[in-house]
Amino acid sequence: VNSDLFLHPDASTIALLPWRPEHGSVVRMFCSITHPDGTPFAHDTRGILKQAVADAAKAGYAFSFGSELEFYLFRLDENGEVTDVPYDQATYMDVAPEDRCENVRREICLTLEQMGIQPESSHHEEGPGQNEVDFRYSDPLSAADNAVTFLTVVKTIAARNGLYADFSPRPL
C-alpha cells in the first residue's frame, strides 16, 4: 500500500557522522515523506509534529523542549553478547572512579557537539549503569531530531567501547 513513497531531504539537518571518517564522509539528514502525487504521508512523524506545532501556533501557543534522555550501559560477554551486568555500580551524581561511564558519556557529548548538537550536561543517574544527558531548550522539531540522533550516537559510542546501550525504563 505504501511501497512508493518519496523522501524530501531537509538540508538544514545535514550532519557528518564523526565516527565514520575512515570509510569516507557519511552524513545523516532528516526527510519529509510524501506519496508520489505530493500529498503528505500520514505516518511521517516529522510531518505530524510540524502540523501540531503549526496548529498550536494558530491557537497562540509556542513550545520549547529541553530533553533529559537516559540510558543504561551493560557489559558484553566474551562472545560479544549482551549481559545483564551493568558497566558500573555508581549512583546519582557519582564521579570517577565509581562512575565508570564518565568517559563514555563524555565521548557521547563530544560526538554530539561535532554534529552541531549542544548537550547542556551529563551525569550518572541513580541506577547501576544508568546515565543521563540533558539538552538545551529548542524548538520541537529540533528537539525531536536531536533525540533520534542521540539514540544512534549512544548506541554507536557504546559499541565502540565494548558496551551495549539500553533505553528501557528499567532493564534491571
Model-inferred region functions:
Residues 1-172:
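Glycine-rich, acidic/polar active-site loops that bind/position phosphate-bearing ligands
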